[in-house]
Amino acid sequence: MKRIYIILFIILGIHFSFAQEETKVDENFPFSLLVRYFNYLNHGKEELKTYPVLNQPESYCIWGCIFLMESEDETIKKIAIARLKGIATQLFREGKPVLLTSGMNSANFNITKNVNLEDDNNIIYVSIADCIVTQAQDKAQGIFNHQTRKLIEENK
């Protein structure tokens, strides 16, 4: 029960923080990819009754999946991983392959790299964290980027 409350708290926090920044999201294209909802993905559909938090719109975006990775529940983590792979695949199919970055000055690196999107397979770089990265964020970044790179290699 405690886990459910923690997860609900995280999801509500995501919802309210995104709601306050709605106008800025549209102006910042790479960031808008982090919060874009992919609610047509069916990953975890069977578990929706047991874990209602998985049916929240916020859990169908990259940021939401990263936050779900913070859960101690392995079922929720597996669903988050499947959704991250699905989102990476969908963005690739749309012609917007995305690589997530993090670490010191990653936001500035991304701005520089995204000036010309046609220089390296049309890859869009999006920063999920600048200095401090949690283990879950790092793992989510690795899973997402691995899927994107795999798709790029398969389609060369």
PLM region spans:
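Short beta-strand and adjacent turn/loop elements
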Residues: E22-K156
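Bacterial Sec-dependent N-terminal signal peptides
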Residues: M1-V25
